[in-house]
Amino acid sequence: MKEKEMLVMNENFNEEDSKIYSKSLMFIKGIAIDANLQQTLIALAVARRMHEGQHRKDGTPYFLHPLKVCSTLISYGIRDDIILAASLLHDVLEDCQNKLPLGGKELLTEYGINHEVYEIIQLMTKESGLNDYELSVYFNNIKKNPKALLVKLSDRLHNSQTLYTFSHNKLKKYIRETELFIITIAQYGKSYYPQYTNALSILKNNIHSLNNSMKIITEIYDKQVEDLTNTIKKKETRISELEKENLTLKNSKKDCE
């Protein structure tokens, strides 16, 4: 496994992208080496390889996202090898299918990711366009696994910090989803997983604060759009009235002639 790990880590990666995420990468690697977190070390290498060449809507290399998700968990006191490894790989099944022709089984058979990490990655993987019932099933499955729950909340927190890249409609859906499901499962975790109370509390509070801020902004925007729309409609109505008045005057003038 060490040979495979080194093979992945020594690949040629985009130099400019590497400069952007190198500090986060080395921070996590240092923590993992000091604590002998073998799954995390493997996950670092695999996630870097899988996300190479991918970028988020804000232009940053995609690999920076799982690094931030993992770093956040570390900063909140999490040192569990399974949790940190899963946080680094949480998007690979969803976003790296072209590099996983066997549907992700390669993570187990080729790279040495263990079954517990793989199970969390599967729980995190979500199809697009789910309705409320399907979303409730998805989030309920996550909340039953405390380690998956931590990864999901850290993922949501980082995504909530880059909502400015979302379209207005997508942003409103995201805010609603956070209110209906994310805050609920975070509260569930605080009640049922006392070993992670501190991390869950911080994650929940930060997500809630960001979500409320974005909700206020969208409500202000919607109100401004509504006011502008009403103003335009009033002006259009007035223009129509003036045109009718003008036509009436013209007709009256013709009659007089």
Predicted regions and their residues:
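Active-site helical microenvironments for divalent-metal-assisted chemistry
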Residues: 2-255
